[in-house]
């Protein structure tokens, strides 16, 4: 699970549906992204869209995703 993504969404006070709407994707697809089941590696375009939706620098998203992938690799 991408805990960093859930934490960022909750910090902004947004629901999954609200984030999905901001990203112009379906709610089920956003849920899959958040739990990490739909994408092994998150596309840069998705990182840019998340950064815009959460009003944070894209580098913050990149760093969080790198950490997530490193943890995922170390536990595999």
Name these PLM-found stretches.
Residues 1-11:
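A short, Lys/Arg-rich alpha-helix, primarily the initiator
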Residues 43-47:
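Long, hydrophobic alpha-helical segments
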Residues 40, 52, 59-76:
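Short, charged recognition helix plus adjacent turn
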Residues 6, 17, 48:
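Residues within the helices of the helix-turn-helix
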Residues 14-35:
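Short alpha-helical DNA-recognition segment
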Residues 9, 20, 51:
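The alpha-helix within a helix-turn-helix
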């Amino acid at each position: 699970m991408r805990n960093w993504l859930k934490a960022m969404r909750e910090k902004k006070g947004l629901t999954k549906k609200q984030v999905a709407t901001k990203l112009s994707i379906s709610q089920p697809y956003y849920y899959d992204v958040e739990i990490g089941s739909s994408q092994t590696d998150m596309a840069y375009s998705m990182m840019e869209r998340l950064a815009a939706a959460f009003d944070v620098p894209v580098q913050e998203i990149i760093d969080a995703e790198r950490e997530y992938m490193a943890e995922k690799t170390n536990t595999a």
